[in-house]
Amino acid sequence: MLRLRSGLRHLRATPNTRGSARLLCAEMPKKAGATTKGKSQSKEPERPLPPLGPVAVDPKGCVTIAIHAKPGSKQNAVTDLTAEAVNVAIAAPPSEGEANAELCRYLSKVLELRKSDVVLDKGGKSREKVVKLLASTTPEEILEKLKKEAKKT
């Protein structure tokens, strides 16, 4: 049998069909009130911020925008803001990802962010898309800029 330091795991050897022994691990029982090292215990788990209509914050802290895309339009425009999504007209055909690339370019211009900070998260082949913003910004700022752009049309 193997001898291990106290406090690790207990190992038991059970016979195998081939004649060799197989080791089984069993966790040692925890003491009442014992805490694990390095982990803080909070009473309530951290919750993401409630969504502000189509703009929300994901668990990693990135701002996300729900988009309803309308590819093949004459010009790029934010046409409407609803509780579910931001309606965006895109002046690119919906083929080979052209409309997705144009959507990210247009949103980066409207939101005054770098193109690399606006990433398509979900909906590559759908009109319902989720765009993730990698830049540090607040949902309120994003919603304000989108409303401002929607009023132009």
From Swiss-Prot:
A single GO cellular-component term on record: cytoplasm
Residue stretches of biased makeup (Basic residues): 1-12
Family: Belongs to the UPF0235 family.
Keywords: Phosphoprotein
Name the record gives this protein: UPF0235 protein C15orf40
Region (Disordered): 1-55
Residue positions, PTM Phosphoserine: 116
Coiled coil: none
